[in-house]
Swiss-Prot record:
Location relative to the cell: Cytoplasm; Nucleus
Polar residues composition-biased segments: 434-460
PH domain residues: 4-119
SMART domains on file: IRS, PH, PTBI
PTM field: Constitutively tyrosine-phosphorylated. Phosphorylated by TEC. Phosphorylated by LYN. Phosphorylated on tyrosine residues by the insulin receptor kinase. Results in the negative regulation of the insulin signaling pathway. Phosphorylated on tyrosine residues by SRMS.
Domain IRS-type PTB, chain residue ranges per copy: 151-259
A Pfam family this chain is assigned to: IRS
Compositionally biased intervals (Pro residues): 411-424
Organism from which the protein derives: Bos taurus (Bovine)
A GO CC term assigned to this protein in UniProt: nucleus
GO biological process: cell surface receptor protein tyrosine kinase signaling pathway; Ras protein signal transduction
Record CDD domains: PH_DOK1_2_3, PTB_DOK1_DOK2_DOK3
Protein name: Docking protein 1
């Protein structure tokens, strides 16, 4: 029969229908032996573990944890402990995570004993040994300045189905390690105790990250080894992962600023040495006798100017104050640009006498040629309200000439009046010869109209076809009209 290494009361957190609650159990830890594997068993009460864990009472469902499947054992802090003064710790396996709690001394003892049996070859000791072994002269110690001060933490997660996860072939449970400069996804090996790195995401290539009560998610950039996309992990430690990532990014920013400050100090010291002349100048390259100096044999700032006839500047002294040299005579009294003006004038005269050459096609760059004058009909204007203008010139007040004497604009000229119609022709007059054949009256002149009066009949309401009313004939006698 197997002997228990440790046993005692433990609180086990369970979740049903979205509600978390603590359940008090009796836990028994068995080591690895020829009769069985190392395991942790849970019972309802203390009496159930008698007889090597084969009690008659009912055992809790699926509450046997094999330590070979254990990934990590670490103390954690919870918001609502099962009782005051209780300390919690998490036991992660390849399938799920278990949250356990006990009083503070018992919780530390459980963590230490579980680490001893689950990781026999690992560094599970929480406290330093009482008698540390003496180091020999040949052994080497790690440099604390070189090794990172923050090792990071590991979390057991389950990959959710996303486009990026399917592209990378991720499914199932993995271990997500939060390191100093990146996130690393570890896959348990064949022995379930060795974690193999599968993917990693540097913090500088993460676009965004966030957490929820039951998951942790981040969006990777296109330069990540996994490619762009969103990765979602189901875990109850989403808040812990988020805080660990945030702390790592903050540490990386501080280290980056410190590195930039050291670079600035180095650059300043280098410039100071150059300014003080402490840097030794490089010796000039040796030249073979008789060989001409190459064009690029020396740097630009160290090229030597060949000695000229005179080192004086052209405008170092005024023209009048330049002393005349012997043998030059009175030729130096000419103006400075005298020869230049004559040379230009001769060129202009020759250009006028010779035939002008045809201008090249690409005389001026595009966009710099002078704009051509627009013609009269280049900008036509569409006439509007032509029916209103009626082909008359539109004259407005501000377009008329201004008269300064009257402080007003000139009045437009009057328009031509409407032409009067021609006078109607007069009635036909009888000639004197016709008058003789008449009634024989000579009293009236021939200017009398033939129809002098036309009266409207009131009784019948119609016009007479002849003379209705009294008609005066040529003799001067009035007669009644007859129809």
């Amino acid at each position: 029969m197997d002997g228990a290494v440790m046993e005692g009361p433990l609180f086990l957190q369970s979740q049903r229908f979205g509600t978390k609650r603590w359940r008090k159990t009796w836990a028994v830890l068995y080591p690895a032996s020829p009769h069985g594997v190392a395991r942790l068993e849970f019972f309802d009460h203390k009496g159930s573990s008698s007889g090597g864990g084969r009690g008659s009472s009912r055992r809790l469902d699926c509450k046997v944890i094999r330590l070979a499947e254990c990934v990590s054992v670490a103390p954690v802090a919870v918001e609502s402990p099962p009782e005051p003064g209780a300390a919690s710790f998490r036991l992660d396996t390849a399938q799920r995570s278990h949250l356990l709690a006990a009083d503070a001394p018992s919780s530390a003892a459980w963590v230490q004993t579980l680490c001893q049996n689950a990781f026999p070859k690992g560094s599970w000791a929480l406290a330093p040994a009482e008698n540390p072994p003496k180091l020999s002269a040949l052994e080497m110690l790690e440099n604390s300045l070189y090794s990172p001060s923050w090792e990071g933490s590991q979390f057991w997660v389950t990959v959710q189905k996303t486009e990026a996860a399917e592209r990378c072939g991720l499914h199932g449970s993995y271990v997500l390690r939060v390191e100093a400069e990146r996130l690393t996804l570890l896959a348990p090996g064949a022995q379930r105790q060795i974690l193999e790195p599968l993917l990693f995401w540097p913090y500088t290539l993460l676009r965004r990250y966030g957490r929820d009560k039951v998951m942790f998610s981040f969006e990777a950039g296109r330069r990540c080894p996994s490619g762009p996309g969103t990765f979602t992990f189901q875990t109850a430690q989403g808040n812990d992962i988020f805080q660990a990532v945030e702390t790592a990014i903050h540490r990386q920013k501080i280290q980056g600023k410190a590195g930039q400050g050291q670079d600035v100090l180095r650059a300043d010291s280098h410039e100071g040495e150059v300014a003080d002349g402490k840097l030794a100048s490089l010796a000039a390259p040796l030249e073979l006798p008789g060989s001409p100096p190459a064009l690029y044999s020396e740097p630009l700032d160290s090229l030597r100017i060949p000695p000229g006839p005179s080192q004086d500047s052209l405008y170092s002294d005024p023209l009048d104050s330049t002393p005349a040299r012997a043998g030059e005579g009175t030729q130096l009294k000419k103006a400075l640009y005298w020869d230049l003006c004559e040379h230009v004038q001769q060129k202009l005269i020759k250009a006028k006498l010779t035939d002008p050459k045809e201008d090249p096609i690409y005389d001026e760059p595009e966009g710099l040629a002078p704009a051509t004058l627009r013609g009269l009909y280049d900008l036509p204007q569409e006439p509007k309200d032509a029916w209103w203008c009626q082909a008359r010139v539109k004259e407005e007040g501000y377009e008329l000439p201004y008269n300064p004497a009257m402080d007003d604009y000139a009045v437009p000229p009057p328009r031509s009046t409407k032409p009067f119609p021609a006078p109607k022709p007069q009635g036909l007059a009888l000639s004197e010869s016709g008058a003789a054949t008449g009634s024989g009256s000579q009293g009236h002149s021939s200017d009398t109209a033939l129809y002098s009066q036309v009266q409207k009949s009131g009784a019948s309401g119609s016009w007479d076809c002849g003379l209705s009313g009294v008609v005066t004939d040529r003799t001067g006698a009035k007669s009644e009209g007859s129809t």
